């Protein structure tokens, strides 16, 4: 080795030692398999916003997005392990899955119950109790229906007995009300905003957040964030990254609502302006908080207990359903 080369090598070694060794490799991105619905609902909106803005990559995550055409297939993907997360889902849906042996845990909140509404065009119907003797289009298998039924019972109203309930998905409930086949429809955002825009006679007679707060003191959660236990064990540090990524989506939506609306219109095919209007209404709220916080855990667990007390579900899940670091 020449003196010049030796001097150069010596200098590089000295520099490396002074800087604590060779440069560390960039932190590897963790692959997370994400179930995404092909419907214009909250789940694909979050997925598309995160991907479009590169938010997953900024948090050392790599979303492997897998599309599903129905809610049943969507939940089945995380139940079977085909996906690590559905991004969002109903607390009592995960309660049922956990009690049936699915290794699912709730790591964060994301959407309060304010996105659940009942709409009517009838001037005679002013509140939920006014539906006595009337017809309601609703998805009776949904968590949202459970929430309405629990509140109704507290008001002395039994759905299915005092109110004739017509089984309908949220999209079909919209159609049934428009055709005049029912007196009211139970829907969620963004369908609610689209309905209110298309018919000036529609009025909101029930809001899930307002009703649940009246009943429990908390707004409750329509959607929470799940992760499979095997994913958590495989990449424990990814839990905090996933929550942080979702919080960045929340911040982006709040600070760049017009850009977010344009992305949603292009990718999820919502009419332009609907996403923005739903957010502005205060009904559609993105609120990502770690599920293990005392207030959040208590609110989620209260929903579990009420589902069992109302006999919608047979039993409570084990404590581990709510993740804690």
Q: Where are these predicted regions, by residue range?
A:
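Short, glycine-/small- and polar/acidic-enriched structural segments
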Residues: 27-159, 164-169, 183-189, 204-208
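Short, solvent-exposed loop/beta-turn-alpha elements that line the ligand-binding surface or hinge
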Residues: 58, 209-218, 285-295
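Bacterial N-terminal signal peptides that target proteins for export
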Residues: 1-10
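Sec/Tat signal peptide C-region and signal peptidase I cleavage site
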Residues: 21-26
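Pocket-lining segment of extracytoplasmic ligand-binding domains
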Residues: 92, 166, 171-266
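Secondary-structure end/capping motifs
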Residues: 232-312
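Bacterial N-terminal signal peptides
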Residues: 9-19
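Solvent-exposed, polar/charged alpha-helical surfaces in well-ordered, non-transmembrane soluble domains
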Residues: 48, 53-54, 76, 80, ...
């Amino acid at each position: 080795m020449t003196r010049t080369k030796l001097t150069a090598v010596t200098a590089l070694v000295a520099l490396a030692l002074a800087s604590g060794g060779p440069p560390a490799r960039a932190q590897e991105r963790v692959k997370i398999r994400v179930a995404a619905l092909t419907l214009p609902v909250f789940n694909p909106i979050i997925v598309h916003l995160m991907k479009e803005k590169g938010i997953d990559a900024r948090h050392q995550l790599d979303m492997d997005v897998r599309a599903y055409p129905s809610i049943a297939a969507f939940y089945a993907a995380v139940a079977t392990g085909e996906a690590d997360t559905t991004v969002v889902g109903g607390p009592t849906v995960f309660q049922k899955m956990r009690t049936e042996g699915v290794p699912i845990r709730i790591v964060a909140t994301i959407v309060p119950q304010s996105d659940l509404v009942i709409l009517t065009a009838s001037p005679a119907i002013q509140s939920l109790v006014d539906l006595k003797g009337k017809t309601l289009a609703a998805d009776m298998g949904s968590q949202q229906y459970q929430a309405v039924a629990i509140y109704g019972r507290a008001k002395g109203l039994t759905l299915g007995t005092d109110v004739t309930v017509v089984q309908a998905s949220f999209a079909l409930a919209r159609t049934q009300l428009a055709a005049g086949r029912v007196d009211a429809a139970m829907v969620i955002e963004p369908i609610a905003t689209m309905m209110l825009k298309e018919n000036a006679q529609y009025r909101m007679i029930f809001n899930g957040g307002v009703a649940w707060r009246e009943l429990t003191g908390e707004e409750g959660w329509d959607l929470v964030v799940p992760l499979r236990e095997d994913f958590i064990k495989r990449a424990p540090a990814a839990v905090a990254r996933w929550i942080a990524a979702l919080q960045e989506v929340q911040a982006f939506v709040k600070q760049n609502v017009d850009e977010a609306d344009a992305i949603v219109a292009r990718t999820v095919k919502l009419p332009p302006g609907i996403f923005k209007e739903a957010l502005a209404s205060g009904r559609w709220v993105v609120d990502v908080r770690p599920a293990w916080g005392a207030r959040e855990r208590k609110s989620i667990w209260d929903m579990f207990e009420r589902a069992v007390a109302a006999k919608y579900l047979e039993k409570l899940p084990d404590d581990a359903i709510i993740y804690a670091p």
